[in-house]
Amino acid sequence: VLLLAGLIIVNLIVNHLPVKVTQFDFSNAKLYTLTDTTTGILKNLDQDVELYYICEGGKEDDTIQKLLDRYESASSHIKVEQIDPALYPGFTSKYTQEDVANNSVIAVSGDVSKVVNADSMYVESMNYNTYSYVKTGFDGEGMITSAVDYVTAKDICIS
């Protein structure tokens, strides 16, 4: 009984540790490790940023979800919230009039927002054998960091 109680307590403690301590990035491309540039931008944040992950329940993109977890654990100014468009169909219209694809991210700080569509996070190339596009790379970090930088910029030029 004491062993079981001890395991439960250890499990509760581990569940409250930040992602960077409990998960390791063994991918060759370091998909889940934030670059020094992103870490620097997040470290210098002086205002809160909401990252809304627009995704239907059960259709999450594991790569994007883990990346967002890294952002949230890297800065106390970043909060990630998953929004199911089936449950909240009008949510994205607060930030854009365009259609927002599943697995997209909306960065919001104050009155400023920026949509990062899921399609723009992946690099695609034409496979001439099958005449179809295939995913060949991932730049989710670059796109999300750019959005965070945009919504927290002191001077925004809107044309």
Regions found by a protein language model. Give the residues of each.
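Short, surface-exposed patches at the edges or C-terminal ends of soluble domains, predominantly
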Residues: V1-S159
